[in-house]
A protein has these predicted regions:
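Activation-segment/catalytic-loop signature of the eukaryotic protein kinase fold
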Residues: 136
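Activation segment/activation loop of eukaryotic-type protein kinase catalytic domains
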Residues: 204-246
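AlphaC helix of the eukaryotic protein kinase fold
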Residues: 102-123
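Protein kinase glycine-rich loop
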Residues: 62-68, 73
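Conserved short submotifs of the Hanks-type protein kinase catalytic core
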Residues: 140-154
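Activation segment signature within eukaryotic-like protein kinase domains
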Residues: 178-179
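Juxta-kinase regulatory segment immediately upstream of eukaryotic protein kinase catalytic domains
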Residues: 3-56
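Catalytic-loop of the protein kinase fold
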Residues: 190-210
Length: 246
């Protein structure tokens, strides 16, 4: 499964959704506006204007919202019916014991970290096994990142689904095959100029994508379409010390 991902796996219209098999993607959705949109890839002129319009208005499905790190992710659909993941910075309620200046510094730090997550994600967008990144803007005044919506399950759920005993152990061969494919994914990071460190590789941050083949079909084939998600802790390798987790 080595190679490069030339584009997003699945931004098809939701009328035939890989998530729910169909239905009205706009039913019960909340409308949000994405302001000050900045594309992940450089463009200008009419192409830039057209690209911004593609993400200007999104319909979010709150039932899909998941919290992780300093943000929350929700599935969003644009007016063309394309689906994306919308990650918005989540700033906690202010501590009444903290001063106004302390709260402002804390919020500024979160925004800086969120921006760094976007920049790190840009470095791997386009690599096989990483979600495609579209851009960054603001939703209701909060920084927001628009990226590929990955259809699949995290390794947490995969382990449960494939467990052969009450302890949650997977078949040894399947575990080795998944480990091989995760290693293959990480090996591509060596091609990046300056390097890249994820720093939070866990069962919750590795997904098995099922938009092409079901989990059962991938088990049968012995190869897994794995994807690394959540770049909130990532950083360029040159910023690391002598100890880190890729």
């Amino acid at each position: 499964m080595s190679g490069w991902l030339s584009g997003p796996r699945d931004s098809r219209p939701l009328g035939h959704s890989a998530i729910d098999g169909g239905g009205d993607p706009f039913s019960g959705a909340r409308v949000v506006s994405v302001a000050h949109f900045e594309p992940a890839a450089g463009m200008q002129g009419e192409a830039l204007d057209s690209y911004k319009r593609r993400f200007g208005t999104l319909f979010v499905d709150e039932s899909t919202r998941r919290r992780g790190g300093i943000g929350s992710v929700v599935r969003a659909t644009n007016v063309l019916g394309e689906q994306f993941a919308l990650k918005t910075l989540a700033i906690p309620e202010r501590d009444e014991r903290a001063s106004e200046a302390e709260c402002e510094r804390y919020e500024a730090g979160l925004k800086t970290a969120f921006r760094q997550e976007f920049e790190c994600h840009k470095a791997v967008s386009g690599l096989k096994g990483f979600p495609h990144l579209y851009g960054m803007g603001e939703v209701a005044g909060m920084p927001a990142i628009v990226m590929e919506w990955v259809c699949g399950e995290t390794l947490v759920h995969v382990c449960d689904a494939l467990a052969v005993d009450g302890a949650g152990r997977m078949p040894t061969l399947v575990a080795a095959q998944i480990g091989r494919d995760v290693f293959d994914l990480l090996a591509h990071l060596d091609f990046l100029e300056g390097g890249f460190v994820h720093r939070d590789i866990s069962l919750a941050n590795v997904m098995v994508c099922t938009s092409r083949l079901s989990l059962a079909e991938q088990v049968e084939e012995g190869f897994f379409d794995v994807c690394l998600i959540d770049f909130g802790s990532s950083t360029p390798e040159e910023m690391q010390g002598s100890s880190f987790t890729r």
